[in-house]
Amino acid sequence: MTIHDLAEYEILDEHRVEDVQSDGFILRHKKSGARIAILSNNDDNKVFYIGFKTPPEDETGVPHIIEHTTLCGSKKFPVKDPFIELAKGSLNTFLNAMTYPDKTVYPVASCNDQDFKNLMDVYLDAVFNPNITKYEEIFKQEGWHYELTGKDDELKINGVVYNEMKGAYSSPDEVLSSQIYRSLFPDNTYSKDSGGNPEYIPKLTYEAYLNFYHKYYHPSNSYIYLYGDMDVVERLEWLDKEYLSLYDYKKVNSEINKQPAFDEIKNVETQYSITMDDSQENKTYLSYNRVVGDSLDEMLYQAFDVLDYALVSSPGAPVKQALIDAGIGDDVYGSYDAGILQPVFSFVAKNANASQADEFESIIENTLKEVVKTGINKEALLAGINSSEFKFREADFGQFPKGLLFGLNCLDSWLFDDMKPFIHLECLGTFAKLRKAVDTDYFEKLIQEYLLDNTHGSSVTVKPKRGLGNEREEALAKELSDYKASLSDEEIKKLIEDTEHLKKYQEEPSSDEDLRKLPMLTRADMKKNAMPFSNIEDELLDVKVVRHDIESNGIDYISFLFDAGDFAQSELGYLGFFTNALGLVSTERYSYTDLANATNIYTGGISTGTASHPDIKDRNNFVFKFEVKLKVLEKNLDKALELMEQMLLSSDFTDTKRLGELVAQIKARLQANLSSSGHLVAAMRSMSSFSRYALYQDELKGIAFYRSICRIEKELSESPKSVSDKLAAIAKKLFARNRMLISFTGNNEAYCNAKPSLEKVIAGFDKMSAVGNQAEVHFNTAKEAFIDASQIQYVAKTGDFICEGYEYTGALRLLRIILSYDYLWINVRVKGGAYGCMNTFLRSGESYFVSYRDPNLSDTLDVYDRIPEYIKSFSPDERDMTKYIIGTFSALDTPMNPEAKGSRSLSAYLEGIAYEQIQKERNEILNAQPEDIRRLADLVEAVLKKDSICVIGNENMIKESAGLFENVEKLI
């Protein structure tokens, strides 16, 4: 039987989607009206999603709350949290749900056929038959609820989405983004934040929430996607029988209307919060925003991505450089959102002054006029096109299955035209057209039409305001206090009872009967053998090469690693700056603009970074490398190596103006990253009180690095030559042949072809004096807190089990899954209201527990301290134990692209990890029993007794817990 024989479906279109090596089908389910798009191919990492068009009508976050709550139990699978049960007990390669401005999507992926079928069933039942209509507690837990524990206690608001969005709205970037869409689309859905504004989330009623669900969650409003190597006919028959045939077509009014263009540009101002003692100088965000066409235009869809690179994102791009030269902003960047009906292109200057708003706009317009008049740099256009095409062809999306990204790409057009899910995947022809257009005035005309003559635009200014967060907290506290005061004794009693009832609901586990309704694999379904390493040693001109014989589709992945273990701690801040600056300064043969363009024309990217590796065999030995990575088509290898050699051996650090621009840019981006990734920053900072690995992470990427960048910025203004000299000294010290190690990922033929080119580049490096001994370090304070302007916290507690005499075993990987999806999930997220909580036990002994967007502080630390008690009483039945084992294998066996396989092998080589050790740990996981987990209670207790904590977050919360800390300071 073929798809053509399925009477339940109408085939609207079928054709070969050659650019993604798939057979494409567009179907309509006749009875329900459901839309189905299929990409059938030989990829065993299968992907499914169901999406719904969900245009928000207000700022209460109802689409976001529904996304959270549909996955909290359903008719067929009535467990309280099937999402977590699947995370614990499936071999998924992706499992999540996402709320977009105009749609909500529920994707899953797996390489295991039965697992894939199970995931589809659970997700489809979740969206069509959720328990949200039966249990208001689900809405309260995930959305929002009043919390009152006693009649004399303070009335509060809690809820997972509520706290998530409090964290989001603490970020000026989030404030800017929401305000841009509000300014450009006042009359359609894009002016409303689908995630929810914390000020308005508590205005959402249970009834309005259910009405939104019933309105939009119907097959007639659905978009169903299947990708990969599967029996498509069987899946479609099952889909019809189990779900779609139960529904008749229903007219769903989910149409998104276009916003009519404006007669003139709109000017909007708003504010974001900084702490009371922060300076307001140079803290304003300025943006120049234009609506550009619609998302169904294949050429525009790609062309403005190229213009983003050519005009503002590439080093020395004309708009960026003009603004930087005028002293407007520390960081200037472009933004292009093509995933909505009317795409938006923006220029943004971060850390400017509000008084510069008019100048900001005039500089952009004058620069664009000059570009139109004289022509865009053709090399920049080609670089932008080649970069986009390389990324598309490589289809490397890190941990995400490429089929998922292809599917989400489909929705950029499919949502607005039922016949066009694949138009942005069939883009190689578009790239060819764009390449030809470089020699015409096509791009200049786009600038004139959409960026200069277009009145559908806005200028949004986001200013800092001291204590705005505190003002809002105080206003909310007063509002809640007044509300409580207006209540009768009976109403207060009801609030207390509701709070207690919700806690009891949260504490009551799902019944064993309900848990057994969830489909599950067995231990026998797990792959017995670990993925092998591929490390073959070779030597070229006395330089060791570790090659990884892996098929890489004609792309060479090469890393040059330089021993940096003898760099003093005082040099690490400069090394971090050096890492960020390399490739962005001019060289002997290239200006920094030409270098960036050539890199993107001839390679898939040249990147620099540092890599820290513990030596498993010798705990006192620490492998610290400076790493230069490049990816390149075999035919362009010589050019790629020439560009890399220029970067490493002839970078010019005497242009202190350029160094100043880079320092300001790094500082601005760190300010955003320290808050947005506060959980990881806090964990590393906490571990830096005892771990060399974490200390280096902090010095090169974290809080210590931010402090170093601030000092370097000051030094550049006072003694610029000293900074230039230090960077030049780092290059001279670091880039020596005797420090070099090369990693090569590609097949044997590719390596043999590359050897002459590698030898040629090696010969260009001098041999220097011997590498010195590992540097001494001074660890940070064990108990620290860092204050920012957010309304939530990131709470970390860390320790080291190897220092306490314990050994790493595979059971620790299992424990991580158990804690993440059971104890921590229930206590920190479900009961505590935090958006997330995670834990890790590294092979080198470092361990952490950390929360994400957490309304609590000391309560979360108490939860961590009770972990050993939980482990001691851990007594699951065989089914639950198997579930945890399957979830652990899911993380172990995530599919990898060639580059990731090479990196995994190289890490094992540097750390001294043998395949036998990995296999032993795998066996320990596969054969684990509850007593193996209980034995880890003392290990975890030893970790927690280290009592190393770090909190990043709200000033008032930190001050209330000041006794916990030895050091409290501002984050930024």
Predicted regions span which residues?
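His/Glu-based metal-binding/catalytic segments typifying zinc-dependent metallopeptidases
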Residues: 40-42, 49-51, 162, 166-171, ...
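Non-catalytic, conformational "gating/processing" segments within enzyme and secreted inhibitor domains
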Residues: 158, 210-242, 723-758
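Long, compositionally biased intrinsically disordered regions
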Residues: 432, 445-533, 671, 680, ...
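Generic recognition of flexible, low-complexity loop/linker segments
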Residues: 94, 210-214, 273-276, 319, ...
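Active-site His/Glu-centered metal-binding helix of metallohydrolases
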Residues: 62, 66-70, 578
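A conserved hydrophobic secondary-structure block that centers on an alpha-helix together
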Residues: 72-73, 196, 200-222
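Non-catalytic terminal extensions that flank enzyme cores
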Residues: 1-47
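M16 family metallopeptidases and their MPP-like homologs
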Residues: 45-55, 81-129, 136-147, 174-199, ...
